[in-house]
Amino acid sequence: QEGENFTREVKSIDKSFLKHGDVTVKVDYSCLNYKDALILNNGAKLVKEFPHIPGIDFSGTVLESESDKFKKNDEVILTGWRVGEIYYGGFSQYAKVDGNFLVKRPKNLSSKQSAILIFFPVIFSLFSKANTVSSSL
């Protein structure tokens, strides 16, 4: 970042680059949340530290944990908590986050299904807005 200008790029980083949190997760799926789109469009307004990894929502498997809430191989979901905004997010193979931000994934949902459910409120909102617009025409 230089002033108000910043660049976007995809690059390889070492896991040691991930510095926030006590649980390291192997990310299976992440979705493009509206805040991710804002960050990718004009990150200087929301992101406080560069370089940065967006990805507000993700599902995955715990690799390492210093939290008493999670252990290796626990399947987890994360949504919100300003992850992908002020903390590194899920647009990466790995994420290191505060264990308090995670929830265990329900056993009856696959990682992919849970990622779809994370995205469902966005889809619902879009359809609701589209229906409101069409009914007012």
What are these regions (language model features)?
Residues 13, 17, 60-62, 126-129, ...:
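Compositionally biased regions
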Residues 14-31, 43-83:
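Glycine-rich beta-strand-centered segment in the early N-terminal region that forms part
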Residues 79-137:
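NAD(P)H dinucleotide-binding glycine-rich loop of Rossmann-like/cofactor-binding domains
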